[in-house]
Amino acid sequence: MTLQEEILLFSHREIKAKDVFYIKEISKPQAYEFVTKYHYLGDAKFFCEQAFGLFAIHGDQLLGVSTFSQPQGISALKGWFGLTNQDKCVYELSRLCMSPVLNRTNATSFLLGGSIKELKKQGKIRAVITLADSNRHVGSIYQVCNFKYYGLTDSKTDFFSADGKVNPRGSTKEVHGVWLPRTRKHRYAYIIDNHLICKYKEEPKPTIDSTLKLSCCNGTGKVYDNRFDEWYTCPRCNGKLERLEDFGV
């Protein structure tokens, strides 16, 4: 039986994931190469302390990668658990990436669940945290893998200046550009050590109906700087802020 045939049977739930795949720790270069090729963010902000690969039993082909890093942000661990950033007992799931041949299968949950089992065996990590972009999804994969849900991140705004910088230092009073709401993220955590207490309140898990819509431009693709009476392309939706000279508005 070919790998393609096995994946087809697996996608129809006629055989189990453990009959098709196995999981093992992989090197950072292996993870980087795979993630760069298949993840929508490419190699942007790629942080990795440990990585695990999903391999086909027959042929040993790498089909998925999970990467774990130290939580990003100077106060991340303090906010979650009251820990300092010098404490290395908590990981953040930084990437979860699959080959397109596994689209519409539950191989992703098999990889994530198996990766956490491996971390448990190693006995060094007390929890795994992750954030799900609220305008993209609600973190269904984390719910399937028994992560606990701890609500949304706080509401914040970002300043996009006309010269392409985001949140430049200093006063923005005389700087051309726009303030836009930052996408809020769903907080999830898998607590390995039950003695580790999360400071955020556990909440009911969100459903797909609670996916938030970006309020940056309300789908128009343009944003307005009312201080200088200027219109720009929406940097959230278009990837960059560009002045629109002749919008006719």
Give the residues covered by each predicted segment.
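A conserved mid-domain beta-alpha-beta active-site/ligand-binding segment of alpha/beta enzyme cores
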Residues: 182-194
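Short Cys/His-rich micro-motifs in 6-15 aa windows
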Residues: 237-247
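Short linker/helix segments within small regulatory modules
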Residues: 224-232
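Cys/His-coordinated zinc-binding microdomains
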Residues: 218-221, 238
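Short amphipathic alpha-helix that is part of the acyltransferase structural core
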Residues: 5-47
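Conserved beta-hairpin
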Residues: 35, 49-73
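Acyl-donor binding region in acyl/amide transferases
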Residues: 22-25, 67-180
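Residues immediately within or flanking Cys/His clusters that coordinate Zn2+
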Residues: 211-214, 231
